Amino acid sequence: MQNIEKINEEEAKKLLIELADKIAQYNHAYYIEDKPLVSDAEYDQLFNTNLKLEQKFPHLILENSPSKKIGAKVENKFAKVTHQVPMLSLSNVFDEEDVKDFLDRIKSFLRLDQFSPIFCEPKIDGLSFAATYKNGILTTGATRGDGYIGEDITANIKTIKDFPHKINNAPELLEVRGEIYIEKNDFTSLNQEQEQQGKDKFANPRNAAAGSLRQLDPSVTAKRPLKYFVYAIGSAKEELANSQDQLLAKFKELGFNVNEIGKLANSEEEIFSFYEYLKTNRKNLPYEIDGVVYKLNDFALQDRMGFIARSPRFATAHKFPAIIGQTKLLSITVQVGRTGTLTPVAELEPIEIGGVIVSRATLHNYQEIARKDVRVGDYVFLQRAGDVIPQITGVDLAKRSADATTFDPPLFCPSCNSKLHYVPEDIIIRCDNGLNCPAQNYERIRHFVSKNAMDIEGLGRKQVEFLIDKGLISNPYDIFFLKEKNEASLTKLENMDGWGKKSVENLFNNIEKSKNVSLPRFIYALGIRHIGEQNAKLLTREFGSYENFIAQMELLKENDPEIYQKLNNLDGIGDKMLVDIIDFFDVKENIELIKNLSEVLNIEDYKETREQSSLTGKIVVFTGSMPTLSRAEAKATAEKLGAKVAASVSSNTDLVIAGEDAGSKLKKAKELGIKIIDEAEWLTLVRDI
């Protein structure tokens, strides 16, 4: 990743778009597909890079910034549940300095003179849930989703052993929140069952828990060894407790499972001592944890601190460092992606790291192999932090044997044997044979049917491979005639290995359902290099309809300077992406495919919908010293109510809140005739909204 200190504004603008797109993709894979694409450490690095860029260039913060989002949007196969109180995720800290900064921010925000107790508890590596009780009866269970809308998993949550369906002495309305997980031993047994049944094994306990809870058939969930802890409250008709430690005691009294491992810390030293204790003893716990959660214990102080876009100010998660292991590198294989990029993959002597058997690891690119001097036959260090494919972090040179061999990048594509070329600026090797390369064609079809694209359920990796091998499909367009082809065939798909009448029927129904597709999904499904979900949405907002999109692409292909400049001015669409778009539309097969698809699909025009509130768009300015509020708390309250807080007064300002020694801003507000109030009036205004 680039050095943030040296990056200029233009580079930052492009990088923020790229990060938003990449993080959105990783969020969807983690929260919705339950199949993380990168390690926790790599994700955290990307997220923190995004935060640092936003801190340096606050005027470049995007509407779809990852720092404003929680989780990922829910799928259509479950009913949607709106969270009355948003289910936010936690910010992360990674060392003692970060923790001290977190504690200092609390003292500064609340203007505290002394340490306020912090409740510390293990961060369970599972799936977050919310359960609502009305008059003591469980009525709704939901996933976090995007933090505002989750999936209805009521039927599934009721199958969990000892999860209360009814609670006594409960308030009229109570929403509890917690984590659903699978213990390590149960996870091992579950994977053994999966293997015996010829099914794919789960990558880790978190994925197993999430996949189990998101089953359409609750009887499948009932067979899975799910457990839960509750640790927070979403909403309630009456106050249950005044602090986190009191709340857990109340939950236990009501019959919920709570994690008994928790500590009320009265100093920094006690916080760090508890963290070290859990880090050392995590291997002895029956379940996976990936850090320690710190919460301001006093609920009244929590309320004052409030939230930022995606997380509470009063809590954070102190993550454990990644788990390291060592094993032998047996060979290096090469994978060809949908855009022709070749990725080296390490094939390893199987090793258990953190309860998961690892036999493959990513090597990223060929420059990375050379930089780390990784050789076949070496003993390599692996880093795993909850990911599917861990990373190789280095080589144990002391164990290097004389016959360890260097790996030379291939000159020809392993799939189609065409000559490869090196792209220096991207540090990659690429096959440019496009759809004539079997590997690229396969990956392109896989991308086309994926959840974020056309979302055709029932066409997974194995099914796509099978249909291509049997000659039933050779490109995305063929998918929409699969039913007709099957009806005309003497050998029916439902009679072939791995298929059945029901699965084929469901597949055809899902294909039919996918024919109604939004324009951004369609653009993303095309698989244009560097055009991810966010950039597809940018293009959609610009063009509005499929017809206009195609017309503008034709002009772009003809090097129309006006359309080129228009697109180049869009945040995140730079010269490099425009070249990729032009290259894509220069390929005759791509144009034919798009034309054919447009004849069988209903590509919906773009419609922008935004929720409005009474304060949406109001611009307020705080100036001077407030008697009771810190500037941070005042700003947070305003933003929570939908206002935009500006640093200076202008003719666009709607309201100025003036404290002592207000100075030039107050003077300018008076000159412009802008409404001015003091802190007391502001607090009254806030209370009455």
Swiss-Prot record:
- Does the keyword Cell cycle belong to this entry? no
Any signal peptide, and if so, which residues? none
Q: Name the catalysed reactions.
A: NAD(+) + (deoxyribonucleotide)n-3'-hydroxyl + 5'-phospho-(deoxyribonucleotide)m = (deoxyribonucleotide)n+m + AMP + beta-nicotinamide D-nucleotide
* This protein's record includes keyword NAD: yes
Cofactor (UniProt): Mg(2+); Mn(2+)
Active site per UniProt? 123
Q: Which residues bind NAD(+)?
A: 40-44, 89-90, 121, 144, 179, 295, 319
Q: Where is the BRCT domain?
A: 610-689
Kindly give the InterPro entries that the UniProt entry links to this protein.
BRCT_dom, BRCT_dom_sf, DisA/LigA_HHH, DNA_ligase, DNA_ligase_AS, DNA_ligase_CS, DNAligase_adenylation, DNAligase_N
Top-level class of the enzyme under EC nomenclature: ligase
Q: Which residues bind Zn(2+)?
A: 413, 416, 431, 437
Biological processes annotated in GO: DNA repair; DNA replication
Q: Name one Pfam family in it.
A: HHH_2
Q: Which UniProt keywords apply?
A: DNA damage, DNA repair, DNA replication, Ligase, Magnesium, Manganese, Metal-binding, NAD, Zinc
* CDD domains to which the protein is assigned, alphabetical: BRCT_DNA_ligase_like, LIGANc
Any one GO cellular component localisation term in the record: cytosol
Give the UniProt family note: Belongs to the NAD-dependent DNA ligase family. LigA subfamily.
Q: Which PANTHER family match?
A: CHROMOSOME TRANSMISSION FIDELITY FACTOR 18, DNA LIGASE
Described by its record, this protein's role is as follows:
DNA ligase that catalyzes the formation of phosphodiester linkages between 5'-phosphoryl and 3'-hydroxyl groups in double-stranded DNA using NAD as a coenzyme and as the energy source for the reaction. It is essential for DNA replication and repair of damaged DNA.
Name of the protein described by the UniProt record: DNA ligase
What phylogenetic lineage does the species belong to?
Bacteria, Pseudomonadati, Pseudomonadota, Alphaproteobacteria, Rickettsiales
In the UniProt record, what gene is named as encoding this protein? Answer: ligA
